[in-house]
């Protein structure tokens, strides 16, 4: 599943249909490679910079857990064996708030966050750091195999 804040909708940069079309396109690309994403959840709101009905406080916007809760109503989510992977501390905070194992990836903003933490001696608030999604997936698979033993 994908959970994503889409403040661009709230700010009027693009519409909800654009977000949905991107998700369809992403799944099409993945399906061509034998994979798929079961569901996409997005928050179109922003508490300060939203326009019209999109300017509001909500439980769906990460670090809130509304999108996770919505997914849990549709799917059987086993928190003990589920992961939140993201490139921002907001993603990690959302996963922590919902009780998931969290992974910060170095793509996007993640490597800068990691560098700053190391430079300033800040302890990580995530469970694992991975350079990219492939390394995150490998760690998840290894962790799963260790849990089975």
Which stretches of residues belong to each language-model region?
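Structural recognition of the conserved hydrophobic beta-strand(s) that form the central parallel beta-sheet
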Residues: 1-3
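A short secondary-structure junction motif
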Residues: 6-19
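Asp-based, Mg2+/Mn2+-dependent phosphohydrolase catalytic module
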Residues: 16-39, 47-84, 88-149
């Amino acid at each position: 599943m994908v959970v994503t804040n889409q403040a661009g909708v709230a700010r009027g940069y693009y519409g909800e249909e654009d977000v949905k079309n991107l998700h369809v396109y992403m799944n099409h690309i993945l399906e061509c490679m034998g994979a798929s994403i079961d569901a996409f959840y997005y928050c179109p709101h922003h508490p300060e910079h939203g326009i019209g009905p999109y300017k509001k406080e909500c439980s769906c916007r990460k670090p809130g857990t509304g999108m996770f809760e919505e997914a849990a109503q549709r799917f059987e989510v086993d928190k003990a064996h589920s992961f939140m992977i993201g490139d921002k501390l907001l993603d990690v905070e959302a996963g922590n708030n919902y009780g998931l194992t969290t992974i910060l990836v170095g793509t996007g903003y993640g490597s800068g966050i990691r560098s700053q933490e190391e430079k300033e001696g800040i302890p990580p608030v995530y469970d694992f750091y991975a350079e990219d999604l492939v390394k995150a997936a490998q760690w998840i698979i290894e962790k799963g195999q260790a849990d089975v033993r």
